[in-house]
Amino acid sequence: FEAVAREPRFRSVATIHPGLPGWEDDLTTAVGAGAVAVRADPGYLGLSPAGPEMLALVQAAGGAGIPLLAAVRLEDGRGRHPLDVAPELAPWAVRQWIRASATVRLVITHADRGFIEEVHHGSTPAEAGRIWWDISWVWGPPDDHLALLLATMGAARFLFGSGQPLRLAETPGARLDLLSLPAADRAAITHDNAAQLAGRRSP
């Protein structure tokens, strides 16, 4: 929060560990401090994604009107250190979260096309409308995974994400450049969707 106070372009995302005592107070503090989302990566926190701790956080975030952010992975498995054994987030976990609360909004990062399609098409339209995806792990040309997702799901479901510092920020920008998107769709992905998501406290 101190860094955000010094830099007007920054927005805070508070990490919450729902397995620790007093996490509810941390959530209240984050909301009061103007955080745009709270984050919990169950694999790295040593928690089951479907366990009571994560489901309690999902419900609490929904009740507080603040989005919950989680990453499918943080880096390519081929480059991970042997001691980095945290499991990747699975599509079924995201579907369980979105069904655990009628008000929670989810931001899922580092998901590939298959993961996104499995969750999106396995959810009801109302559920899918409360999930946003960053594009950091979605292939662009020549495979055109991003183009296909935008054609089938619409630009409103996507956010610009780079995966920094473990991935290059230029890559997702190049993917958008190669697509020659309408100006409105590009603006939605690069900033409008995020601004709308951060600026409202309830669905």
Predicted features and spans:
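Solvent-exposed polar/charged
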Residues: 5, 32, 99, 151-152, ...
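Active-site gating/metal-coordination segments in enzymes
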Residues: 1-76
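Active-site glycine-centered loops adjacent to acidic/histidine catalytic or metal-binding residues
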Residues: 163
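Conserved hydrophobic residues forming the short capping helix/wall of the S-adenosyl-L-methionine
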Residues: 4, 123, 180
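Catalytic pocket-lining loop regions of alpha/beta-barrel enzymes
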Residues: 36-37, 50-159
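Secondary-structure boundary/capping motif
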Residues: 22, 49, 141-142, 168
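Short N-terminal helix/helix-N-cap motif within the alpha/beta-hydrolase-1
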Residues: 21, 116-117, 169-170
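Mid-to-C-terminal alpha-helical segments outside catalytic/metal-binding sites
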Residues: 28-29, 153-159, 167-203
